Amino acid sequence: LIKSGVVPATKLDFIFRQDTSGLIVTNAHHVNAGEPLEVRQGETDFYFMRCEDPETCVKRAIEFMTTRIPRKFGMDPLADVQVLVPMRKNILGTDNLNVELQKALNPRGDAIIRGGTMFRVGDRVMQLRNNYDKDVYNGDVGFVKAVNSDDRAMIVNFDGRPVKYDGGDLDE
């Protein structure tokens, strides 16, 4: 449909929310163009891990987040570091990596479970859909500040602004 020109379409080719001089943006363009990634040694905003098998990749990702990056750059792994993967399912997808990273970085505390996902006080979360009523949008990142297991609700802090999520909203 898009190629036919019958329906109006817009191609988004500008990357927002990121320093345009970094390797993250450069490599995002390479991925979109089907080109090889640019990888540099030393201090950079982009690290690529090549692993022998998926299980090793998970272990290395956890090690990078919990030890290597905080030690080398003095960063808080919960607040300052982002793991990007291209899929949700399987051992290397966001679903599993989020569980493993939560075990390593935020293993204790009050929690609620929705649809198999555990939300724990202190977790970093990302809004997946625009919610105009709450004034939060796809890609916004916040931290779980409080949970109420009786009401199946939680409060997420987005840049100092608390937003309440009820049971049905937790899928957002």
Predicted regions and their residues:
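Conserved helicase motor core of P-loop NTPases
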Residues: 1-125, 131-133
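Conserved nucleotide-binding/hydrolysis modules and their immediate coupling elements
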Residues: 99-172
